[in-house]
Swiss-Prot record:
Cross-referenced InterPro entries: PEP_COase, PEP_COase_bac/pln-type, PEP_COase_Lys_AS, PEPCASE_His_AS, Pyrv/PenolPyrv_kinase-like_dom
Gene that specifies this protein: ppc
Keywords linked to the UniProt accession: Carbon dioxide fixation, Lyase, Magnesium
Domain of life: Bacteria
Record GO terms (molecular function): magnesium ion binding; phosphoenolpyruvate carboxylase activity
Catalytic activity: oxaloacetate + phosphate = phosphoenolpyruvate + hydrogencarbonate
Lineage of origin: Bacteria, Pseudomonadati, Pseudomonadota, Betaproteobacteria, Nitrosomonadales
Similarity section: Belongs to the PEPCase type 1 family.
Cofactor (UniProt): Mg(2+)
SUPFAM superfamilies assigned: Phosphoenolpyruvate/pyruvate domain (SSF51621)
GO BP terms: carbon fixation; oxaloacetate metabolic process; tricarboxylic acid cycle
Name of the molecule in the record: Phosphoenolpyruvate carboxylase
EC nos: 4.1.1.31
Function summary: Forms oxaloacetate, a four-carbon dicarboxylic acid source for the tricarboxylic acid cycle.
Gene Ontology annotations for the cellular component aspect, listed alphabetically: cytosol
Length: 933
């Protein structure tokens, strides 16, 4: 992105017929406007300084020009505090505007394919359904699939989401104005107005504070999560259902029945207490109330809008008797409109929705109006009324009016209910142990300490208490603050289910679950709150979900579930949950524990073993993938990731976390949001119905080889991170981890405990820190050594390499693993990483650790190219390669500035401007990388 029309970092291939021509033009336009803004508001000198830095950075990046690197260092090291802030903001906004142009171009290219009548692309529901129909899957099988499926991205609040709402709003405005130029035949005068609006938006953006002035509260995080319903979910999810039904109808050559609602958005925001003391019972209630308020407000608006269009007159049409009955109960219309039954019906629905919002305690517009209507008992009654309208229209030759907005509203009501999204509860197993220990102490005469009992003894006591009708809690005041807090949470959970329905709060996740005892402890706590009962009629209104996170726990999780299903009482309990058990697998902590290769491999093996155990016990399995935005935390393209799962492990059931800045990048723009949701649906359909990974059954030696690779990779990773003397110091000094803790980007502390031990550090800031210094260890370290050892020990190096190449060609798991590593390596930069290493005060430690990192990086590159046959990174993904090539020259100066600022700050310059500049660079680099945490 150039600040003026003379400079141009983009390759010269730039004719109007070239497919990326519009992208280049958008980038130039936005860059020129940002440059003009800097010139107008900061002066010509500042403009020239920023442009000099930009051109020098481009020269260094493009030509590996050492003189340019030295020149860049000299400029950046001599900036004043004021100049530093301006330069950081300039390059941060370069990255942001490039992202906007790039997202728009993705949409542009997809629309071009559609207009040209090109075949549907991988990841589209159109192609997925074509493939399953071609295989011979009939309409009834597809209907059964949708009826039993659940696909659920779950929004979580984590300290890597650095965008403010104000910034997101202006991103959308700029994108809308660019779309206007793209799709509309503007007159010269309209084009001038469009450019002025763009300039105004960019100027406002430049003068808008990027950083939050105070740390986010959980309430703030709840509101931030809700904006994506307005941006994308409320309208795009019904659109996807309509698209699926229309495709099925075309394939069946007849009207397809309505498919079941299987795609739903979940949330942890306001229910995730693990390590966050600010999530209380009041906060959880607030989250449920805000969810309900938003969706009821949406329904009221849509009913108003649709009702205004339903001007059909009884003098010209007929209606069903059901609709007549519904219209007769509605408030009156003016005499001039008394012959309009559909309007009367929508007026009645509108009144009942307002009464419902008042009944549920939602504070939304219209609730203070005089209204004697009866509230809906639940969302099913609302859906029933909409169905009466739809049937009447279809029965009386008005089918088209039953489509569009009315069809979408009916689907929204079925998907979102009156609760909007299922809110998950989550807490650490150690907290449950503490609470149960207190309950045990207060209710038994046993001298033993609960925590000192063996696990089998605990299980025996827990099962006995679960069968016993008595309550262990008489008064909250008898217990510690921690126990009181947990008991109040569960009491509030029962109240939320009573008010908003069981679907509002259906899941309880146990962090760091390691055994059956942890599951039964939660069962007992749910029993105390009236959410679960054992005995003659066992049932539960909550799914108990163990989260297995460490390498050891992943290896043992199938045995844990086998033991759990061997308990007759628990098996009976599952019948009340549709005989389905959910298990969550943690990518982040397992990566921090054992490294990239081993984390992925152990999760893959765990899925295989879990599938076998569940099949043997006749229990349905749903896997919940706890992953982040980065490859180091399980991120990467969703389509390939789901297709790479072991056979039988998906079976139409998948939940996965959407975290940090990934939520904004995926779901701010509605077209991109719809595409991402479609991708999840398409991959789940194909993975379930096509059984693409049959290689698992035919090549067991692949697993033997992966076991060897994983063992070597884990040893190399742990040797570096946990066994290298002084590595903790290297990490703390060569990354901005301590400065991240001061950035107001999340409500949770960066560590679970008040400690700077790597074991206690949350996986999110761990990965975020390595991303910011461009080392990105969690996404590749250990792979190079693993392959090197395997090839050398094989005896015949060429034969060993051929085996790995065959595995790569035929096994989706290894393809996805190496593709994700390829992406990480393309964003890493050891030249910049070495500059961060210079911040380490011990020269011997710096030399020792960074030499190990560089050696492993070179081995990774060597063997990645050898196995894939590529000669450069991202050779098979030119779109991503182009994206990184465009953005990197704007990220590099931010990294160089961050290094200099960290050096100043750690040397005692604690000027507020320096702190703010450091935080701005953290924000800017995260924006440029796009999946940093």
């Amino acid at each position: 992105m150039s600040l003026n029309t003379r400079a141009n970092i983009i390759p010269e291939k730039n004719t109007p017929n070239e497919k990326d021509y519009p992208l280049r033009e958008d980038i130039r336009l936005l860059g020129r406007m940002l440059g003009d803004t800097i010139r107008e508001l900061e002066g010509e000198t500042m403009f020239n300084l920023v442009e000099t830095i930009r051109q020098t950075s481009v020269r260094f990046r493009r030509d590996q020009d050492e003189a340019a690197e030295h020149e860049l260092d000299t400029i950046l090291n001599h900036l004043s505090h004021k100049e530093t802030i301006a330069v950081v903001r300039a390059f941060s906004y370069f990255s942001l505007l490039s992202n906007i142009a790039e997202d728009l171009h993705h949409n542009r290219r997809r629309r071009a394919h559609l207009r040209a009548g090109s075949p549907p692309q991988d990841g589209s529901v159109t192609l997925a359904l074509q493939r399953v129909v071609k295989k011979g899957i009939d309409a009834e099988q597809l209907q059964n699939f949708f009826a039993s499926a659940l696909i659920s991205p779950v929004l979580t609040a984590h300290p890597t989401e650095v965008q403010r709402r104000s910034i997101l709003d202006y991103q959308l405005k700029i994108q809308r104005l660019l779309k206007e130029r793209d799709r509309t035949q503007l007159t010269p005068n309209e084009m001038r107005h469009n450019e002025e609006d763009l300039r105004s938006a960019i100027q406002t953006l430049w003068q808008t504070r990027v950083l939050r002035s105070v740390r986010l509260t959980v309430q703030d995080e709840i509101e931030n999560g809700l904006i994506y319903y307005h941006y994308t979910f409320l309208r795009q999810i019904p659109y996807i259902y309509a698209k699926l039904e229309d495709i099925l109808e075309r394939h069946m050559d007849k009207a397809a029945p309505r498919i079941a609602s299987f795609l739903r958005i979940g949330s942890w925001i306001g229910g995730d207490r693990d390590g966050n003391p600010f999530v209380t019972h009041q906060i959880m209630l607030h989250a449920a109330e805000r969810h309900s308020a938003l969706i009821l407000d949406f329904y009221i608006s849509e009913v108003e809008r649709i009702g205004q269009t339903m001007s059909l007159s009884e003098r010209l049409i007929k209606v069903s008797s059901d609709l007549e009955g519904l219209a007769s109960t509605a408030p009156g219309l003016p005499a001039s409109r008394i012959d309009e039954p559909y309007r009367r019906v929508f007026l009645g629905i509108h009144a009942r929705l307002i009464a419902t919002s008042r009944h549920l305690g939602s504070s939304i517009r219209g609730c203070c109006q005089e209204n004697n209507a009866e509230p809906y008992a639940d969302s099913a009654e609302f859906v029933h009324d909409l169905d009466i309208v739809i049937r009447s229209l279809r029965q009386h030759r008005s089918d088209r009016l039953a489509q569009g907005a009315l069809r979408d509203l009916r689907r929204a009501a079925d998907v979102f209910g009156f609760h909007l999204a299922p809110l998950d509860m989550r807490q650490h197993s150690k907290i449950h142990e503490q609470v149960i220990s207190e309950l045990y102490e207060k209710n038994t005469r046993d001298d033993r300490n609960y925590l000192e009992m063996s696990r089998s003894e605990r299980v025996e006591w827990l099962l006995a208490e679960l069968r016993h009708p008595r309550s262990l809690v008489t008064s909250f005041s008898d217990f510690s603050d921690v126990t009181q807090g947990e008991l109040r949470i569960l009491k509030m959970a029962a109240e939320i289910q009573r008010r908003f329905g069981h679907a509002a709060l259906p899941n309880y996740i146990i962090s760091m679950a390691t055994g059956v005892v942890h599951i039964l402890e939660v069962a007992l706590l749910l029993k105390e709150a009236g959410l679960l009962q054992f005995g003659d009629d066992p049932r539960s209104t909550v799914n108990i979900i163990p989260l297995f996170e460490t390498i050891d726990d992943l290896r043992g999780c199938a045995s844990v579930m086998d033991e759990l299903f061997s308990l007759p009482d628990y098996r009976k309990l599952l019948l009340s949950r549709d005989n389905l058990q959910e298990v969550m697998l943690g990518y982040s902590d397992s990566n921090k524990d054992g490294g990239f290769v081993t984390s992925n491999w152990e999760i893959y093996k765990a899925e295989i073993e879990l599938t076998r155990v569940f099949d043997r016990h006749g229990v349905r399995l749903r896997l919940f993938h706890g992953r982040g935005g980065t490859v180091g935390r399980g991120g990467g393209p969703s389509y390939q990731g789901i297709l790479a799962q072991p056979p039988g492990s998906v079976s139409g059931q998948i939940r996965l976390t959407e975290q940090g800045e990934v939520i904004a990048s995926k779901y701010t723009d509605p077209e991109i949001g719809r595409r991402n949701l479609e991708t999840l649906v398409a991959a789940t359909i194909e993975s379930t119905l096509l059984d693409r990974d049959a290689v698992h059954y035919h090549a067991p030696h692949y697993h033997q080889i992966m076991e060897e690779l994983s063992s070597s990779a884990c040893a190399a990773y742990r040797d570096l991170v946990y066994k290298t003397p002084g590595f903790k110091q290297f990490f703390l000094e060569s990354t901005p981890i301590r400065e991240i803790a001061g950035l107001h980007i999340g409500s949770r502390p960066t560590s679970r405990k008040p400690s700077d031990k790597i074991e206690d550090l949350r996986a999110i800031p761990w990965v975020f820190s390595w991303s910011l210094n461009r080392t990105m260890i969690p996404g590749w370290y250990g792979f190079g050594t693993a392959v090197e050892n395997f090839v050398q020990q094989a005896g015949n190096e060429q034969e060993a390499l051929k085996q790995l190449q065959e595995m790569y060609r035929t096994w989706p798991f290894l393809q996805t693993l190496l593709s994700n590593m390829d992406m990480v390596l393309s964003k890493s930069d050891l030249g910049i990483a070495s500059r961060y290493a210079e911040l380490v005060t011990d020269p011997e430690l710096r030399q020792s650790v960074f030499t190990s990192i560089r050696t492993e990086w070179e081995l990774c590159m060597k063997w990645l190219f050898a196995i894939t046959g590529y000669s450069e990174l991202l050779q098979d993904n030119p779109t991503l390669a182009r994206s990184i090539r465009i953005r990197t020259p704007y990220i590099d100066p931010l990294n160089h500035l961050q290094i200099e600022l960290l050096r100043r700050y750690r040397s005692g310059d604690d000027d507020d401007t320096v702190r703010r500049a450091i935080h701005l660079t953290i924000n800017g680099v995260a924006t440029g990388l796009r999946n940093s945490g």
